[in-house]
Amino acid sequence: DNNMMKRYIIGICVCLAITLASAQTRREMGGIYHAYPKVDVKEMSQTPSGYKPFYISHYGRHGSRWMTSDERYIKVAQYFDDESNLTPMGLKVKKLIINARDNAMGHGGKLSKLGELQHKGIADRMYRNFPNIFAQGNSVQARSSVVDRCAKSMKAFIDELRHLQPSL
């Protein structure tokens, strides 16, 4: 019967929607606004017998950054302008938003401290896991686009390698 078929299709759609909705965590829903998680790899894959690592080619994106413009922080804060519409919790959130906005001013699109630490962490892990590649006498070549946050990400990476191996 036609009614039964409609119920069946609706049921399948609901089940599919529930399955898709559970495919990501609340934290992952932030998408590009969520910092990459720090992952501790306990054990790396072993180098195949008879081989020795000699080269790393690392293509990295800029680290975590402030939102693209100061205007975005201002716009979010404006939603809290009318305090008559805010609950006590809303007033607390407003203070946090205003503090975030004030801290962000002048940093729109720039690399954040977290972004710098992310690239230092990548360099540190490479150095610890492949010390022979960064041994005295070896060299590192680095290139970046002209975008400030990209150049500063590269600088953080290289600065950390130089800290670990001053002869680079």
For each feature predicted by the language model, list its residue ranges:
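Bacterial Sec-dependent N-terminal signal peptides
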Residues: 1-25
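Non-catalytic terminal regions with compositionally biased, polar/charged low complexity
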Residues: 24-168
